[in-house]
């Protein structure tokens, strides 16, 4: 994430990464209405080992405390639990994006300039606390 990890070929850092925020339950409702499969993982979906779930009542299995903390270290599998992911098959409707978080004023301006003039324009905010 800081362009220095030996196992990653990406060296661009976090600045160009956008965070798209949406309401989890609205997305699930949309997916179910449109026969789109969805799932979430209890850890990083890109790892060799992960567990996934696909029922609303299983959301309680997520370690919400780990997900919400700004710390990546500590016991009880915090690092793994923090990497839980929500996945949706094929596509995601742009109109469900409620906010875009960016790292810097430069990226903020680039994103604002790229949003469609006549369409859905979710608010864009510099959210440094969303980055590490």
How would you describe each model-predicted region?
Residues 1-132:
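Active-site-proximal loop/hinge segments that shape catalytic or ion-binding/gating pockets
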């Amino acid at each position: 994430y800081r362009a220095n990890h030996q196992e990653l070929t990406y060296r661009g850092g976090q600045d160009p990464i956008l965070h798209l925020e949406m309401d989890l339950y609205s997305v699930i409702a949309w997916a179910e209405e449109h026969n789109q499969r969805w799932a979430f993982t209890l850890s990083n979906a890109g790892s060799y080992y992960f567990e996934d779930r696909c029922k609303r009542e299983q959301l309680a299995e997520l370690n919400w405390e780990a997900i919400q903390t700004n710390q990546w270290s500590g016991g009880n599998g915090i690092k793994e639990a923090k990497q839980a992911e929500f996945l949706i098959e094929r596509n995601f409707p742009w109109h469900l994006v409620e906010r875009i978080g960016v790292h810097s004023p430069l990226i903020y301006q680039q994103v604002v300039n790229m949003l469609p003039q006549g369409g859905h324009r979710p608010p864009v905010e510099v959210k440094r606390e969303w980055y590490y």
